[in-house]
UniProtKB/Swiss-Prot annotation:
It holds the Pfam family Ribosom_S12_S23. The gene is rpsL. This is Small ribosomal subunit protein uS12. It comes from the Bacteria. It comes from Ehrlichia canis (strain Jake). InterPro entries: NA-bd_OB-fold, Ribosomal_uS12, Ribosomal_uS12_bac. The keyword Ribosomal protein applies. With S4 and S5 plays an important role in translational accuracy. Interacts with and stabilizes bases of the 16S rRNA that are involved in tRNA selection in the A site and with the mRNA backbone. Located at the interface of the 30S and 50S subunits, it traverses the body of the 30S subunit contacting proteins on the other side and probably holding the rRNA structure together. The combined cluster of proteins S8, S12 and S17 appears to hold together the shoulder and platform of the 30S subunit. The modification 3-methylthioaspartic acid is found at residue 90.
Length: 123
């Protein structure tokens, strides 16, 4: 516990908010290149093979893991993708999403509902 005098000399510092998607550098989206596309398993109560990609962000080259949403994808090594923030709760270390229907990432096939989230045009 500091004394009043100590607080007068050096006031308390307010803690700055933690950035949840630091690799985006305060941008809404960033372009990235896929380094490795693979599947991984989720945390304890859930069971699946979740599709993820290790991507290298254009401009300054930091590598992050991004989730590939939707059923089926056409991504492979050297695919250019657009990533956004947003974690996947049951995959530790996955703090970014790949935007479907932008750049090399194709929209989800035969998608009828929630099309805007998966890059599908109205048919």
């Amino acid at each position: 516990m500091p004394t009043i005098n100590q607080l007068v000399r050096k006031p308390r510092k307010s803690r700055s908010a933690l950035n949840k998607a630091p690799a985006l550098q305060h941008n809404p989206q960033k372009r990235a290149v896929c380094v490795k596309v693979y599947t991984t398993t989720p945390k304890k109560p859930n069971s699946a093979l979740r599709k993820v990609a290790r991507v290298k962000i254009a401009g300054y080259g930091s590598e992050v893991i991004a989730y590939i949403p939707g059923e089926g994808h056409n991504l492979q090594e050297h695919s250019v993708v657009l990533i956004r923030g947003g974690r996947v709760k049951d995959l530790p270390g996955v703090r970014y999403h790949i935007i479907r229907g932008a750049l090399d990432s194709r929209g989800v096939q035969n998608r009828k509902k929630a099309r805007s989230k998966y890059g599908v045009k109205k048919s």
